[in-house]
Amino acid sequence: MSRCEFGVILCLLLPAGVVESAGVDRPNIVFLFADDQRADTIAAHGNSNIQTPNLDRLTREGVSCRQNYCAGSYSGAVCVASRSMIMTGRHWMRIDDTRNWTGLPLLPEVLGKNGYVTHAVGKWHNGRPTLARGFQSGKAIMMGGMCDHTRVPLQDLTGEGELTNSRVGDGFSSTLFADAAIDFLGTQEKSTNPFFLYVAFTAPHDPRNPPESFRQAYYDNPPPLPGNFLPQHPFDNGQVSRGGRDEGLAEWPRQPDVIRDQLCEYYGLITQLDGQIGRILDALEKHGFGEDTIVVYAADHGLALGSHGLLGKQNVYEHSMSCPLVVRGPGIPGNTSTMAMTYLLDLYRTLCGYAGVEVPVGVDGYDLRFVFEGTQKSVRDSVFLAYQDKMRTIRQKNLKLHVYPEINYQFLFDLEADPLEMTNLAKNPDRASDIERLVCEMKAWQQRLGDTLPLTVETPKQKEIDLTGRSRLPDKWQPKWIRDKYFGGRDTPDSQGNPAKKRNE
């Protein structure tokens, strides 16, 4: 076994065990989970163009993981794979049954069997059987991947695992989910058991229709375009040529004014969500849970939104695979950051550790408690990112290698000098040894994960692509003003692909 193979296997498998950690025994756990939120959209992390006072408060009171990643996805619905990894603690390549997670103990399931009251609120995109197996109850559950934020289909989860009380929520999605979370906290004041409250928002996922006052505030003071904005992606990465709903939310080539307005709407969703985070944090204090509760704030992945000419998250750039992770709680020093490279799936081991619960056999990742508490600087030497059979990426320290097997193309970025991933160093002969080392590391990860994708092909596809003029019809979740603004008033196609009649809204 090579040295790099051994290092990767240790990184993925080394059991952290259940060891003592500073702070109270059996803390409550509140997991606040955003949808499609870029890592660079928290003001306290250096973005002066966005208003996030409550997330800023959370960063002042906790630790921020500044190099946190989603590991990628087996499908265009990256959120499904991301949530699967969090709930099972396994890399997506090691989840054989991606829908039902057969035979895999789920994080809330394990906590529930060890005395925790487990309750779910909000988005669940992984099927009813897993929801019912994982949680003892739930309110304001939105089954599926997305919805119009003003027309949220809601259900409640009973103790028997049934979904009941189907309704359309009267209010904005993030507000409805915060209301349900706050209601649950009010029921726990006299409970003698700790609780695990999972609140999965569907913001800032599109449709990007925040309440008008929130989007108008950013129209009046718009954020700049991303520093790596491009009208088109410069080559066929295997995904853009296939289309996809995310990339169809604006025409090619991307127009600066269109992307700027979509950024305003996206920021408006985040600021509105931030207010609901503040309400939940205040409710924790009101009900006496502030001192003995672990609060996790994270997102399932990032989003391009104009970066590299892309809109979606079906890629392996930093803007799409990195995502926020902020944790507050007993024993965690406030106003601190860590540059340890972490995965979202590490939260399984970490939260089991805080709960004093034995980690099930087969769970990947690391317990991050000592990273959060400042006594450990790092947990892994590299991170491996992958999207379907189209892209493979390895990051080690400041170097990041992208491999696109279908076109036999490599990109090497120095993230310290080039955090926006714009300058390809792969053709530089002085970097040949770096590429060789990173390919070795990548292959070691592939071997461990059972990833048999070749990194080159005998007959590569054409690299060049021009998507000028490509567009698509809006999906059923886009409200009328978005259809009018970005789709020329066109409507959702019917089952035969014909434009449907206009809806009056």
Feature-to-residue mapping (PLM):
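N-terminal secretory signal peptides that target proteins for export/translocation
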Residues: M1-S2
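Bacterial N-terminal signal peptides
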Residues: E5-A16
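Formylglycine-dependent sulfatase
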Residues: V19-P405, Y409-F411, P419-C440, L453-P454, ...
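Residues forming the ATP-binding cleft of Hanks-type serine/threonine protein kinase domains
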Residues: E416
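Sequence context surrounding c-type heme c attachment/ligation sites in exported
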Residues: K443
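Short arginine-rich
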Residues: Q447-G450
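Mature extracytoplasmic/periplasmic domains
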Residues: T452-E464
